[in-house]
A protein has these predicted regions:
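Residues immediately within or flanking Cys/His clusters that coordinate Zn2+
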Residues: 114-119, 141
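Short, conserved beta-strand element in jelly-roll/cupin
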Residues: 37-38, 50-69
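Short, cysteine/histidine-rich loop/knuckle motifs that typically chelate Zn2+
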Residues: 121-124, 145-146
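Short acidic-glycine-tyrosine-enriched beta hairpin
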Residues: 70-89
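Ligand-binding loop in jelly-roll beta-barrel domains
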Residues: 86-114
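Short linker/helix segments within small regulatory modules
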Residues: 132-141
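A short, N-terminal "cap"/entry segment at the start of jelly-roll beta-barrel domains
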Residues: 1-32, 141-155
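Conserved short histidine dyad/triad with adjacent acidic residue
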Residues: 19, 35-51
């Protein structure tokens, strides 16, 4: 048995104001478990994405979270859950004025290949992206695979 308090975790850099990797602390082997707290404009993901092998479930604890999906926008409010199958593209965003707290669950823990798309200002369209650590590991950037332009920076 493992028992932990969410506030005992270090924050993980990324597109969310608060991201805590609960699965690692609990020693989960077959699923990923993350806690997010999103400021207005924040997301749980670096861009519109799909995991090759992993299904994802998001449980909104507080607030309202809007997902861009292949079927259009879907808004999930407190005490609602949304599921995405492996290979299904999505991106969340806090479009409100308040903070959103959400629990993300992914299984299996090994998500496989990540397909990640973001708007590239140099290419003028949404393109494939890579994520890399920069500044001696103090930040993550998303970079366009086609032209190499930096499309996002997260500390």
């Amino acid at each position: 048995m493992e028992h932990v308090a969410i506030d005992d975790f270090d924050n993980w850099m990324g597109p969310a104001d608060v991201k805590r990797l609960l699965g690692k602390a609990l020693g989960t082997e077959h699923m990923g478990l993350r806690f997010y707290e999103l400021a207005p404009g924040d997301s749980t993901a670096f861009g519109y994405h799909a995991h090759e092998n992993q299904e994802e479930v998001f449980y909104v604890l507080d607030g309202e979270l809007t997902f861009e999906t292949e079927a259009g926008e879907v808004t999930v409010v407190a005490d609602e859950i949304i599921r995405f199958a492996p290979g299904e593209f999505q991106r969340s965003r806090n479009e409100g004025d308040g903070r959103v707290r959400v629990l993300g669950i992914g299984a299996p823990a090994d998500a496989g290949e990540l397909a990640l798309l973001r708007e590239c200002p140099d290419c003028g369209e949404r393109t494939d992206q890579e994520i890399e650590a920069v500044d001696d590991g103090d930040a993550l950037v998303t970079r366009c695979v086609d032209c190499g332009a930096e499309t996002g920076r997260f500390a």
